Amino acid sequence: VARAAAADGDLAGEVDWAGVGVLNAREAEPAEALRAGGAVSSEEGGSPELLLLLPFVSPVKLQAVRLEAPEAARAPKRVRLFANQRDLDMDDAAGGAAATQEWTELAWGPSAAGGGALAASLELNFLKFQNLGFLALYLAVEEEDGASVAVQGFRLSGRV
């Protein structure tokens, strides 16, 4: 059966949502919250980091990731992406393993969602995200900022 991404390149339909994991999340059902565009944040009093583990139904070609955050204080400052690395833990994702691509500063701007929400687009090195069956996203703010990290949605763009 031939598969195709949405006309606008949205790969949400290619994510195997039943297999999605979110490490260090405060919410009881973080995968469902992400799928519905709800906020997912790190545990209070813990380290301000999240690790999203996203399996795909079939291999995709990822071109861009768009993140949304509820407010500037909790928006990720550091993002590390890992292609096809299913065995990551938080220590690996934070720096113990080499990332496929990494950002240490994001350009956040107003989100279409409004209400103080922000959005940032990450353009990927397309050649590094071909034949992608699994994506891990590590999101963090600096520990000294004292805030938890939070995202309230993301969009994966590419091709099947």
Feature names for model-found ranges:
Residues 93-127:
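Extended, solvent-exposed segments with strong compositional bias
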Residues 1-55:
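Disordered, acidic Ser/Thr/Pro-rich linker "stalks" and the adjacent N-terminal cap
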Residues 38-94, 126-160:
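Aromatic, loop-rich ligand-recognition surfaces of beta-strand-rich domains
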